């Protein structure tokens, strides 16, 4: 239905939250009786999705303020759509992209990125408070003028650190044209400088969630060896499930 969804990556090739770790708990010197702790799902106002790969597991939250993308993603996860699909396009210091249904059992020689799920594109849901910081979960798209999203392909940002001067240049050269009323907040500037991202995509592609655990997995996948076309030499398969 949609052609060349991976336009996102072809454009950026020219241009080119935080991991949660459990504190180490000291064991008591003596234990009289083992106790069994009940496992409780994380409490969150947003829906949480677990993304499992050979390089580790990520947990992402889906923003309630982007309900069209949130609900579509949940539907696909719950149906098993993403299971056994690949992160088929990987660019270090940029992003890892997946969700093309054609990537399941795809031969190594196949160019991926043009596939879609049944149904229409998802209308754009740009929000000023959602931006392409490291760990951002966003929707890929083709070059349609409405900037509507692919109904299945997504990417997770690795990016790189951006200082204030660089961010101002990016804003003036592109982001401002995407949305003249948008301005970076002080907090957003600090985040780009501290953890990085891909600011040149802001207000141009819909960000609908973010990785809140397993951010190191993004770095591991983004660092794999790739072939021409940015497909990993060794397939990076995914499996997803909703946590709440």
Please tell me what each predicted stretch does.
Residues 1-23:
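Bacterial Sec-dependent N-terminal signal peptides
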Residues 20-244:
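Cyclophilin-like peptidyl-prolyl cis-trans isomerases
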